[in-house]
């Protein structure tokens, strides 16, 4: 799997959400994508997944152009997505959520995400952390080539975050790449060998997490000023 984002610009009216962003991801890989609020992280996932139409630039998955495809067409190419607010079918059971539209055996995916004992419960009865795990199980059940995760640890406490991080560690299976948007930098540092930073719609850093705190552009983005060296 090879994802190539080349010079992508996305505008919403007078607002430039992404400006000339270039990024490449191979497999297996778990790429962290971070940045302050409003940096363009979710918009980049939307552009890859067909939910936002770039004004300029191209996006290719294994040589296939994604830029003009609808979300369902992108999904058929092997791209799966989770969202900041989990999108699950609340009137269906947990196992029905995983099986829906796929015809797969939900058992292995529920076991992998710690939801096996709740398989017959309605999804509406799940707590926030369980809902996030269910959405991840749904995404993984399609055995995607590219997995886009938008703040899967958002709103979770320390114990729940540790449990989710353990699940995410195994998400970049052979033949799959993962782009992980996450505000909790300790999760990024633990899971990712590479991290890209967006600020005001532009990519300002791309490298190992250990180098984040030494980069003046990253410090400027997060602190509003460059830290003296």
Where in the sequence are the language-model features?
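Glycine-rich phosphate-binding loops of nucleotide-dependent enzymes
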Residues: 2-229
């Amino acid at each position: 799997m090879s994802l190539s984002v080349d010079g992508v610009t996305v505008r919403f009216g007078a607002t430039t959400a992404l400006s000339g962003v270039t990024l490449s991801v191979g497999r297996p890989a778990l790429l962290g994508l971070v940045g302050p609020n409003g940096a363009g992280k979710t918009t980049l996932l939307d552009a890859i997944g067909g939910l936002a139409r770039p004004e300029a630039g191209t996006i290719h998955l294994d040589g296939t152009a994604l830029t003009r495809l609808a979300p369902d067409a992108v999904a058929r190419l092997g791209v799966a997505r989770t969202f900041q607010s989990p999108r699950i079918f609340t009137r269906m059971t947990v196992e029905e959520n995983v099986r829906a539209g796929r015809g797969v055996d939900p058992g292995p995916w529920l076991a992998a995400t710690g939801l096996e004992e709740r398989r017959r419960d309605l999804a509406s009865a799940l707590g926030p952390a369980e809902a996030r795990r269910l959405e991840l199980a749904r995404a993984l059940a399609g055995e995607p080539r590219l997995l886009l995760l938008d703040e899967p640890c958002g709103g979770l406490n320390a114990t729940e975050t540790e449990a989710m991080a353990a699940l995410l560690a195994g998400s970049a299976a052979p033949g799959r790449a993962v782009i992980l948007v996450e505000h909790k930098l300790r999760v990024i540092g633990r899971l990712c060998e590479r991290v890209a930073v967006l600020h005001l719609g532009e990519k300002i850093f791309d490298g190992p997490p250990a180098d984040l705190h030494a980069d003046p552009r990253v410090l400027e983005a997060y602190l509003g000023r460059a830290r003296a060296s």
